[in-house]
Amino acid sequence: LLGDAIAALRATQPENAVLLARQAVELGLDDTTVWGVIALASRNMGDYRAAHEAADRAIAHDARNARAFVVKGDVFFAQNNPRAAAAFYQRALSLSPLHPEMVQEIRVEFLRAQTRLQDLQTAFSDHMTREVQPLLDDIDHCTPRMQGAVDLLLGKRRLYYPEPRHIMVPDLPIHEFYPRDYFPWL
């Protein structure tokens, strides 16, 4: 039954795929593949509640099932929840980065996820820039620390963690480069 469900899914017959996969579940098959088929077919039919639940079941069986994370991202994207969609797309792409040897149907899904993730990140960056820019333009109140925080938030810079070689002083705050005026003897 599962093979027939996969064939129906590939033949763009999601209703048949869900029906056959659910029959396989009723017969005792309970693994990541059957729930993945149900998740993909339900998403393709627009039944986002069922797709979400099936993707959760697939992830419960295999926490590294990147395709189930893509389905969850698609569900949240369709439900206009960009924050959750971006998180699930990011997780999927970190579990299974795009590579040339990927099966074509999976590659298409991951390319879509990557494109949507980039679009969501760009929209978030534009939104934050639009909302925060007036505060940054106020030279009297905008400090380099505030500008650094905004750059971290927008992904323009990464947080630096020191990697001491000789001695570690645990109570020092983390600064990428300490300002020279803190050390007048240098």
Region spans (language model):
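Fe(II)/2-oxoglutarate oxygenase catalytic core
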Residues: 74-80, 84-186
